[in-house]
UniProtKB/Swiss-Prot annotation:
PROSITE patterns xref list: G_OBG, GTP1_OBG, OBG
Record's protein name: GTPase Obg
Cofactor(s) in the UniProt record: Mg(2+)
Family, similarity comment: Belongs to the TRAFAC class OBG-HflX-like GTPase superfamily. OBG GTPase family.
Length: 390
């Protein structure tokens, strides 16, 4: 199945049903009181995480999703039926972003989590709502409001513990092949990896972690060069980043400048991602004598001013890879998982939140003209008489 991690859709929540103007009629009661019911609320649109899905490919073919409209109110104080909701099933780790405002509308990182992305319209109010001591025969009602319409960009963020980044041909895919059962494509030309891939690394029985390999970055990726930085979003939920550095690039480029390029592109993309724990991994140490490799690595570390963890490996010959995986397992076991706090100020505002308050204050009210009722006398309304057999 083709891996699709981004799709654009248009969602439309259901319109609210209209309120109605109606009066109670019965034998011997020529002119009863108001009994117009409210309309039904429009259906909402949700996204729900489903662990059985792993791609957004379905949303490439069907781009429009809408919930049901609420029914109109009826006489006899009958309220209209609420419109059915529309639930869009998406892979775990999907977020919905408003295309026009770039606002993150929803994010589902757990199986079964369900979040509203489009609010249905409010129901209109029937004329019963406007009855008062000075208005015994109200002809006012309110119309149901339109459901919310949004254009969303669905983005799938892979849920991995370790994220790998580096220039093309640095050896990221080779490393994943050597430490897991994943088999990403490996070749001696740039951009062999075109889509992200995941590998599960088992350190000890019943303990494992997931490594994400993303396509390589080049200078200017933040401006769209190469494959751009669209795949860097997959690193946002990673707990540790491995920066793979080729100490002997096949094109003769400077490893120090290559490392600085990756760091610069990462910082341009997101300060939050750049602040994550990051380890340097020097690959292809078997291509030169050990002493020469150590000198080269020390030169790079000093040039970068690096004070964190760094490792020497040969991914193709599996030199140092086992030790690196054990260190990663120990580090993540002691590293608390990030818990994203939902702040009140970041709550998404939907339309029509104050609609009913405005309606009861006299705004958005529709008055129906009906001359047949203009001469209705309050004194003729004796109430609803119920006859009971003895």
């Amino acid at each position: 199945m083709k891996f699709v991690d981004e799709a654009s859709v248009k969602i439309e929540a259901g319109d609210g049903g209209n309120g109605t103007v109606s009066f109670w009629r019965e034998k011997f009661v020529a002119k009863g009181g108001p009994d117009g019911g409210d309309g039904g609320d429009g259906g909402d649109v949700y996204i729900q995480a489903d662990e059985n899905l792993n791609t957004l490919i379905d949303y490439r073919f069907q781009r429009f999703y809408n919930a049901e409209r609420g029914e109109n109110g009826r006489g006899g104080n009958c309220t209209g039926k609420r419109g059915k909701d529309m639930t869009m099933k998406v892979p775990v780790g999907t977020r919905a972003v408003d295309i026009h405002t770039n606002e993150i509308v929803a994010e589902v990182a757990e199986h079964g989590k369900k979040v509203m992305v489009g609010k249905g319209g409010w129901h209109g109010l029937g004329n019963t709502r406007f009855k008062s001591s000075v208005n015994r025969a109200p002809r006012q009602k309110t119309m149901g409001t339109k459901g919310e319409v949004r254009e969303l960009r669905l983005e799938l963020l892979l849920l991995a513990d370790v994220g790998m980044l580096g220039l093309p041909n640095a050896g990221k895919s080779t490393f994943i092949r050597s430490v897991s059962a994943a088999k990403p494509k490996v070749a001696d030309y740039p951009f062999t990896t075109l889509i992200p891939s995941l590998g599960v690394v088992s350190v000890v029985p019943e303990k494992s972690f997931v490594v994400a390999d993303i396509p390589g970055l080049i200078e200017g990726a933040a401006d769209g060069a190469g494959l751009g930085i669209r795949f860097l979003k997959h690193l946002e939920r990673c707990r540790v980043l491995l920066h793979m550095i080729d100490i002997l690039p096949i094109d003769g480029s400077d490893p120090i400048q290559n490392a600085l390029t990756i760091i610069d592109e990462l910082e341009q993309y997101s300060e939050k991602v750049a602040q994550k724990p990051r380890w340097l991994v020097f690959n292809k140490v078997d291509l030169m004598p050990e002493e020469e490799a150590d000198e080269k690595i020390q030169e790079i570390v000093e040039a970068l001013g690096w004070e964190g963890e760094y490792f020497k490996i040969s991914a193709v010959n599996k030199i140092g890879t086992k030790d690196l995986c054990f260190k990663l397992g120990e580090f993540m076991e002691n590293l608390p998982r990030e818990v994203e706090a939902i702040e009140e100020e970041e709550k998404v505002n939907f339309m029509w939140d104050d609609y009913h308050k405005d309606a009861m204050a006299g705004k958005n009210v529709v008055t129906e003209d009906d001359d047949d009722w203009d001469d209705w006398d309050d004194e003729e309304d004796d109430g609803h008489v119920i006859y009971v057999r003895d």
